[in-house]
A protein has these predicted regions:
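A short hydrophobic/small-residue beta-strand
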Residues: 185-187, 365, 450
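ALDH superfamily catalytic-core signature
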Residues: 237, 245-390, 453
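Rossmann-like NAD(P) dinucleotide-binding subdomain of oxidoreductase/dehydrogenase enzymes
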Residues: 137-283, 410
């Protein structure tokens, strides 16, 4: 049970200026520059982080390469790597509340969700891949009896990882844990707006015994640090979660440099499809509201398009409005808050523009959408439901990354499929129906990396998360994630 007094004791702890973590040491940026960290809770600065440049990235990559070639981690026995990664998981769990509160101060996620999704998920991820280290085998090819064909899986070398601001510890672990499990060294760039929890993770990894240089963390802007990692000739693989525009740029950087493998988890405009035979409309309304309004809609798999069969449209919209209206938006470190803050002033301004544009284009505002709690100095927005949305409207096509839900009515199953697949994205989706046949047909028909049936969200580490089409390539989570961080090598042996 979360204790409000413990949360309150952590929320005001001073945060010392944060340095870069390179070659197992904390050091300032080469240029001596720093960045103010603004809390979305009250709009005030509460910390400073180093602003790295190209020289710092080069130092981090050099340290990572030296560690990889030296073999302190890459050639460590799997049992040894496993032991250290399990220790990392234990330390994350031991400091879970501290990490969660720090992350909330950084990006505004409501504390109940943050505790589970950030340190809780990160610890589970490190434990999952630690246990996988000694359970992934090579292969023996079916060759002629005069030849032995062995297929080895090797670490790729140096991995660059660029992580977003919305769930930095969770998504960071999704990149780091499988990359480390495979024996790689890593250069990690957190988001400029949310770096603090990943810097703490670096300290935890060092305490757990991860050899120096195996993990390096460089903070700063995407235009400087991100570009320097993506264009570096000695980075072998780049893993990124973020916007489509940046993803395209990273592919260009790969082509301009060493043709490094680039894995992208990008945006979404995920359809949540409700048929008239959905088993429980109250549950549909509650789960669908959580699917778009948790973390103020700042979730890549958010169910931002609600496609509702026309015969139940009015009833479901009414129930959904009731659920949304009951959500308490407020201080994300207050256990009474259901929804926290928008991550930044810029993000809030963008959300408000989307809301105004939706009304201008003819959508009907059912509830919410306005900025609230402005007197706190923080960045808060009431969850918004827009009805009578057509597929031509901006709100139906573009990712908002905020608490704005577009409701679109449909008549027949074919219409639902057409609408679901009408965007450039293909990350997540859901289908609500009592018909097993309908469920199976929709799973096949909807072009998305994950199709929920009679639920939304909550998939665990046992299944991959990745997108289709312009939602990206490659997958986080599951054993399939290891494929991104390994290379195949064939030994062809004449007997």
């Amino acid at each position: 049970m979360l204790d409000q007094s413990k949360i309150d004791s952590l929320r005001t702890l001073p945060v010392t200026p944060q340095s870069l973590f390179i070659a197992g040491r904390w050091r300032p940026a080469a240029a001596g520059e720093e960045i103010d960290v603004i809390s979305p809770i009250d709009g005030k600065p509460f910390a400073r982080i180093a602003r790295a440049g190209r020289d710092d990235v080069d130092a981090a990559v050099t340290a990572a390469r030296k560690a990889y070639e030296g073999g302190s981690w890459s050639r460590m026995a799997p049992a040894g790597r496993k032991k250290i990664m399990l220790r990392i998981a234990d330390l994350i769990e031991a400091r879970a509340l501290e990490l969660a509160v720090l992350g909330v101060r950084d990006n505004g996620t409501e504390i109940g969700m943050a505790l589970k999704a950030e340190p809780g998920s990160a610890a589970a991820t490190f434990r999952y891949y630690a246990e996988a280290i000694d359970k992934v085998y090579g292969e023996i090819a079916p060759t002629a009896d005069t030849v032995l064909g062995l297929i080895h899986r090797e670490a790729v070398g140096v991995v660059g990882a660029i992580v977003p601001w919305n769930m930095p510890l969770m998504i960071g672990a999704w990149k780091l844990a499988p990359a480390l499990a495979a024996g790689n060294s890593v250069v990690l760039k957190p988001a400029e707006a949310a770096s603090l929890s990943l810097l703490q993770l670096a300290a935890i990894c060092a305490e757990a015994g991860l050899p120096e240089g195996v993990l390096n963390v460089v903070t700063g802007s995407g235009s400087q640090v991100g570009e320097a990692i993506a264009t570096h000739m000695d980075v072998d693989v780049l893993a990124f979660t973020g916007s489509n525009a940046v993803g395209r740029r990273l592919l260009e950087y790969s082509a301009r440099s060493n043709l490094k493998r680039v894995y992208l988890e990008l945006g979404g405009k995920s359809p949540n499809i409700v048929f008239a035979d959905a088993p429980d409309l109250d549950r549909v309304a509650k789960v669908s509201a959580n699917g778009i309004f948790r973390n103020s809609g700042q979730v890549c798999v958010a169910g931002s398009r609600l496609l509702v069969q026309r015969s139940i449209h009015d009833e479901l919209v009414e129930r959904l409005a009731h659920v949304a209206g009951a959500l308490k938006v407020g201080d994300p470190l207050d256990l009474a808050s259901d929804v926290g803050a928008i991550a930044s002033a810029a993000q809030l301004a963008g959300n408000l523009r989307f809301a105004r544009q939706a009304e201008d284009e003819g959508a009907r505002l059912v509830s919410g959408g306005e900025r609230i709690l402005e007197e706190t100095g923080g960045f808060y927005q009431r969850p918004a439901i827009f009805d009578r949305v057509s597929q031509e409207m901006t709100l139906a096509r573009e990712e908002v990354f905020g608490p704005l839900l577009a409701v679109i009515a449909f008549d027949e199953e074919a219409d639902a499929v057409r609408l679901a697949n009408a965007t450039e994205y293909g990350l997540a989706s859901a289908v609500w129906t009592s018909s097993l046949s309908t469920a199976h047909r929709m799973v096949r028909a909807v072009r998305a990396g994950i199709v929920h049936v009679n639920t939304y969200g909550g998939s665990d580490l046992t299944v991959p998360l990745g997108g289709h089409r312009q939602s990206g390539n490659g997958h986080d989570k599951s054993l399939h994630a290891l494929e991104k961080y390994t290379a195949l090598k064939t030994a062809w042996i004449q007997l």
